[in-house]
Amino acid sequence: MLVHQAGILILQGLSGAVFGILLFYLLGSLLTRRWIRIDLYQLLLSMAVAFLIAIVCEVYLGKLYQLLTGKPLWQYRVWPIHDGYTSVLNFIVWPVYGYYCYVLHHILHARQISIRPAWLKGLVSGFDGPLLEILANGFFLLFYGTFYFYYLPDDMRHFTSIQVVPLYMVMGVILTLVLDYLRERPRRWHYPAGFYLAGVGFVLAG
């Protein structure tokens, strides 16, 4: 029974991931006016690094928020772990954020838009992160009748919250700096493999 339920939840996560990947690819191709050509190494690197950094940041920044305010900012509703600060399904979902970052990087490069210093680009996550959360929660509510995660403040109808913006900025700066560093390193497949496996280990530790 537990295996069956886990299988259903994993399929739900995969459906959301496929939806996000298709949406971001089509929007990116539309904005660049040509089909985006995928560099498999750079794509997998972006997805793996985003997975590890995002899942660690959401747990520890979430705990820091609770330490400072006395209450949590969000709680996962689907397969929660690490005291509800993240979900087992994020081994599927968070890499899609890395896919989004890859597409965004491609769009900026195609349009010859350079944001410097590099950390400034990371601050963008403070604005696009909450929008993507609304998309994720909207998908789960529409197709599965539940919030994927639930924000306790009701300033954004519990889909996300303005209060999460600075947390996304911190995570975005870390992610941008790490990715920029690794993109300039010689290609080594142990980078994406290592980051992804470390993220899976963090999930299993929850």
Stretches found by the model and what they are:
Residues 1-206:
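Aromatic-rich, lipid-facing transmembrane alpha helices and their immediate juxtamembrane interface loops
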